[in-house]
Amino acid sequence: VLLTGVVPYGDMRLEAVRLAWQQNGVNEVLNEISIDTGYGLDDIAKDKFISTQLFTKIFTDTNIKKFKYDFEVQKQIVYLFGVSSDQKEVELVIEHAKEIKGVLDIINYIQSR
C-alpha cells in the first residue's frame, strides 16, 4: 500500500499508517504522506498539471503498456508504481516524468518481475 498526501499534523500521518496495516492482505505500507499546513490551491493546481502531463505522455507512447503503471503526484513529487518485466519500459516512464516542468523529484516504486 502506498500512502501519499499532505496532512497538517503528525498524528494524522500515523493514523493513516495504522489504518492501512489493519486491512486484510497488506504486506507492506509505504508512507509518503507529508506534514505541511501550507498546502494550498496553488500546490493542488501544480500537482494536477503534472499528473495530466504524465498521463498524456504515458497514454500516447506506443512503447509503454499503459495498464502496468500508475502514479500519484503530491507536492510536485511523482510517485510511480506498478509491476514490469521490461526495464527499458520503466526507464521510459521515468524519462517522461523527468521531462515535465515543475517535477521536483521522482520516487520509483515499480517492481521488476
Each language-model region and where it sits:
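N-terminal targeting leaders
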Residues: V1-R113
